[in-house]
UniProtKB/Swiss-Prot annotation:
Presence of keyword Signal: no
Gene encoding the protein: rplY
Keywords, in A-Z order: Ribonucleoprotein, Ribosomal protein, RNA-binding, rRNA-binding
GO biological process: translation
Protein name as it appears in the record: Large ribosomal subunit protein bL25
Superkingdom, taxonomy of origin: Bacteria
Amino acid sequence: MTDQGIVKINASLRENVGTGPARAVRRNGGIPAVVYGKNRDSLSVFLSDREFLSKHRSAALSTHLIELEIGDKKEYVLMRDVQKHPVTDRIQHVDFQFIDYGTEIKIEVPLIFTNEQKCIGVKRGGVLNILHRTLSIKCLPNAILQNIEIDLSDLTAGHSIHVSDLNLPPEINVVMKEHNPAIVTISSTSMEKEGEGSQEPTAAPSSEN
């Protein structure tokens, strides 16, 4: 993965853990965080509130590989959870996971739907139904997708786009409970259906006596 796909964030080790020390970190403009992983000791760290919010707004951190700089060490991690205050919405805590470059990881990738206004089915009165807004995938860390774009322009009423219709790289494995589920469909409106069946019947030829 190129540097363009990696987000760099500074962190510092926390000497004291628990509710009291965590509150002190927040009062001083920090965000408590933990880094965990298989066969690794967990690290308690804190982040700069200002830096993290800036990076969080500018990139979808949950689908970016993160280079966490902890003192003079660098750790590659994924952001796994962000806890927010229920009233103020301020970030209270962040969970990161250590990454092993040789081991596949599972992530939820957002689906971006494009050309809805050009969609044939919508222009003809159909109703767009989005069934999934994310796709669960497994891949190596250097193959992470930030998002998946789905072009709706050619979708017609009564048709769907399924997982198998997506042009995904071969190194991406889709992990879904259903086999090849539909992601988006266009359903016909009742008015459209009535319009299709409201053609005046052809008059039968009159017989002359």
